[in-house]
Amino acid sequence: MASADIFTLTVRGEASHGSAPHLGHDAIVAASAVIMALQTIVSRRNNPLNALVLTLGTFEGGQRFNIIADKVAMDGTVRTFDPKFRFEIEELIRQTASDVCRGYGCEAELEYSYLTGAVINSNAAVVNVARNSAEKLYGKDFLGSMEKLTGSEDFAYLMEKAPSVYAFLGG
């Protein structure tokens, strides 16, 4: 299962009346451009053989229909299996958002939280013990393999402390 991190990205501009947009810096337009640019982290900065999901799930900005917004707040999540690249993504988001916002006369502020690492059964000895135990209990036909899942699981914390294996039971 993938690592999971969350972030809040705030874009700050300068409000103005809708009849005088040239007097402000539109945070909604800048934030929209940031969303598109962030996807280049997935498609151009990430090794295409490494699964990476960067999702922006909320977008809140503006106060009135006729006012150029001075602030947009967006919340998102990042999922990956690559522990090294995981810790590069925060800076890539910060740099991309700041560079795009600067072009619109706005500023970007990033709050990033590392939640849980990837759950990867990498200890071959423990995997073999679990596999052999499952075969003895349920038979070889019971065992299968799964594709990677971009869901996350805090079991990763236990895996950091003790030799472990993570498995699904049942159908």
Label for each model-derived stretch:
Residues 1-40, 49:
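Fold-level recognition of mixed alpha/beta catalytic cores in primary-metabolism enzymes, strongest
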Residues 29-171:
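Metal-dependent amide/peptide-bond hydrolase catalytic core
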